[in-house]
Structures are given as structure tokens and as C-alpha cells.
Amino acid sequence: MRDKWRKKRVRRLKRKRRKVRARSK
């Protein structure tokens, strides 16, 4: 159960990170 939650959070973090990278550029 915890693994599933962490995977979901990681996916969301990855998406947010991509947006932040484009903004930083």
C-alpha cells in the first residue's frame, strides 16, 4: 500500500519537476 502511494506521488513530482525545469530555463 505504501509503495503504491509513493509511486503515485513520484509520478506527480516528476510531472511538476518537468514544468519547473521549463520555467527555470
Swiss-Prot record:
Component of the ribosome, a large ribonucleoprotein complex responsible for the synthesis of proteins in the cell. The small ribosomal subunit (SSU) binds messenger RNAs (mRNAs) and translates the encoded message by selecting cognate aminoacyl-transfer RNA (tRNA) molecules. The large subunit (LSU) contains the ribosomal catalytic site termed the peptidyl transferase center (PTC), which catalyzes the formation of peptide bonds, thereby polymerizing the amino acids delivered by tRNAs into a polypeptide chain. Component of the small ribosomal subunit. Mature ribosomes consist of a small (40S) and a large (60S) subunit. The 40S subunit contains about 32 different proteins and 1 molecule of RNA (18S). The 60S subunit contains 45 different proteins and 3 molecules of RNA (25S, 5.8S and 5S). Initially thought to be part of the large ribosomal subunit. Crystal structures show eS32/eL41 to be a small ribosomal subunit forming a bridge at the interface of the 2 subunits. Its main location: cytoplasm. It comes from Candida albicans (strain SC5314 / ATCC MYA-2876). It is found in: Cytoplasm. GO terms for cellular component: cytoplasm; ribonucleoprotein complex; ribosome. This is Small ribosomal subunit protein eS32. InterPro entries: Ribosomal_eS32.
